[in-house]
Amino acid sequence: MKSMSRGLIRGLLITLFAAPFVLNGGNGAAAAGAADPRFPGLLQRFLSLDDPSPSAYRALRRLDASNQNLNKAAWMDVWTEYDKSGMFKYSVVAEGGSSYIRSKVFRESLETEKRVYESGAPSRAELTPENYSFAEGAAADGLSGVVVTPRRKDILLVDGSIFLKPEDGDLVRIEGRLSKAPSFWIRQVDIVRSYRRIAGARMPVAVEAVANIRLAGRATFRMTYEYETVNGRRVGAPEPRSTTNESLARSEP
């Protein structure tokens, strides 16, 4: 039972860590949506945005994960960098909590993200008419809602809604459920992905996920991004958490 539980945590968090990266919104949709009469004005503006991915960035990511039923929790602060050559690299600078999650989940997940950059897989999950159908949705938090329905079952696609700024159609949030369960053991994964304009580029700033696992119950995951540079422009000075002050700093299995 113990080895199975560890395997469930590992499989879940690797999936959650990879999912935010490939849920990058809208970058490839301009040509598809620019003059399509199927889409209302605001959605058409979003699909028509000429919004290429940033050519380079450096960010401090803060990762936290827990499962109360299995009494496991961990955290990690990681410097991540993406350069103009398309290379992704990372450096762990602070960590605490379950040594298993830190060594076998977080670090392996970073390697998974590195492989995703190299493989070009994000195109499978872009917010384009090829991947999704779109319909008018309910407003929330002063944002205009659009219902997004995947055109196929895929763990990289979200069945839910996107929320856009009403004045310009810029993407602020994606939320919903992964359209395909990552495995038999992971019954469902609900995810919220948040974006913000930084140095003119739309950048991910947070991802939160909750998963229901057979025999293990509810597991939670949160990752935030604090940027130091975007496209060569300095935008912040993030600092890692201190292991002496962090409540999860105590090493455990």
Model-predicted segments: where are they?
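C-terminal segment of classical bacterial N-terminal signal peptides
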Residues: 19-27
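Beta-strand-dense domains in secreted/periplasmic systems and polymorphic toxin scaffolds
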Residues: 174, 205-209
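Structured extracytoplasmic
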Residues: 29-159, 166-170, 180-189, 201, ...
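C-terminal soluble interaction/assembly domains
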Residues: 191-193, 207
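Cys-His-centered catalytic/binding microenvironment captured across papain-like cysteine peptidases
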Residues: 198
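Bacterial N-terminal signal peptides that target proteins for export
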Residues: 2-15
